[in-house]
Amino acid sequence: MIAPAKAATELSGLAGFIETYKPILPVPALVAILFLVWLFFRDTWRELDEDALRMRAEIHAEGRMDHRPFVALVLVAIILTMQEYYGGRIYFETTIVPALSKFAERHVAMKLTKYEELYGFGWWAGTRVFGYVLPFALWKIFFRKDSLLDLGLRTKGFFDHAWIYGLFLAFVLPAMLVVSRSPDFGTYYPFYKQSSRSWFDFLTWEAMYFLQFFALEMFFRGFWLGALRRSFGSGAIFAMAVPYCMIHFGKPYLEACGAIVAGIALGSLSMKTKSIYQGFLVHVTVAGLMDWLALRHRKATPLHLWPTDVAPIGNAWLLEQEKREALARTIERTAAGIFAVLFVLMVVMIVRSRLHRHDRLWTLPRTKA
C-alpha cells in the first residue's frame, strides 16, 4: 500500500504556480532557455554550417550526390514506425503474451503472472535497443568508408568536456526537483508500476531503462547527427529535435515541452564533444532521479530485496513505512557522498587533462576546425 500523489489543488508555492500556469509556462521558459543554448553553442553551430558548406561544395565539384540524408532519414522513419506499432504494450499483450503463456506453462520459473508487466517492459526496451542500434550495422553496409566512431562514439577528450555535464545538471536538477512534485510526474513515473514492490523490480527496471537511454542517445545524437551533419550542418540538430519531441507525446506536458530544449541542447553537446557520452550521463541521471523522486513523494520506495506475496496491514504497515523511509534516507545520504567523491575525482581529472594540454583552466577546450 502506498500513499497517493498530491492533487493539483493541494500544491503550494512554486510547484503550485507551475501547475496553475502549466499550459502557457513553457513558452517564456523555452525562449529564455533556448537563448542560453544559443549563447553557449552558437560557435559550434557556425562551425557545423561551415563544414557542411565546404563538404557540399566538394561533392558538387566532383559531380556526385551525397546519398546519406536519403538513407538516414528513410531508416529513421522506418525504425520509429516499426517501434510504434510492434514495440509497444498493445502488440506485446495481443501477440507476445499468448506465446509466452504457452512457454510459461512448461517453465514455471518464469513466473509470468507475477512479472508480466516487467516482461512487457523488457519487450519495450528490447525493441527500442534493437531498433536504435540497427542503423549502425546497416550504415557500415551502405557506406563502408565511413567510421562508426564518427557517429558519436568517440571517447577521446571525454574529460576535456566533462565539466559541461556538471553545468547541464546545475540547470536541470533544480527545475526537475520542482516539477517532480507535479501530480503528472508523481503518478506517471516510474513507467513500471511495480518498481516499489522490491529492489529486484526497481533495479531490473532501471537497468532496462538506462540501456534503452544509451541506445536512444546512439540513435538520435549519434547516428542521426553523424549521418546528416555534412549535408545539413547545424540544421541536423534542429531536425532531430522534432521526432525526439514527438516520441515524448503521451508523457507529462512539461516533459514533452522540455524535450524540445533537451533535443537541441544534447544534440549540440554531442556535436561539440564528438560523442554521446556526456548527453547519456545527463539523461540517465535525470531519468533515474525522476523515478526515485516520484516514489519518494508517494512514500513508495522499495524495501524488500524480492517481491513478497503478503501485504502488511494495520500496525505492520505503519512499521514497514517507517523502515521504508529510514532506508530511503540512508540511501540518499550514501548516494550524495558517492556523488561528491565522484565530483571531486571528475574535477581532478579535468584539471589534469587541461594542464596536460597546456590550456587555461577557465577557457573552453580548443576545438578542431
Regions found by a protein language model. Name each.
Residues 148, 221, 225, 263-267:
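Interfacial helix-capping/hinge residues at the ends of transmembrane alpha-helices
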Residues 1-147, 294-369:
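N-terminal, membrane-interfacial amphipathic/helix-forming hydrophobic leader that caps
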Residues 77-85, 170-179, 241-249, 284-296:
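Aromatic-anchored segments of alpha-helical transmembrane domains
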Residues 237-241, 246-247, 254-337:
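Functionally important transmembrane alpha-helices
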Residues 124-143, 156-185, 191-249:
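Function-critical hydrophobic alpha-helical transmembrane segments in multi-pass membrane proteins
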Residues 57-63, 152-157, 225-230, 274:
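Membrane-interface helix-boundary motifs at transmembrane edges
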Residues 149-152, 188:
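Short, hydrophobic secondary-structure boundary micro-motifs
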Residues 25-26, 67-75, 123, 127, ...:
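Alpha-helical transmembrane segments of integral membrane proteins
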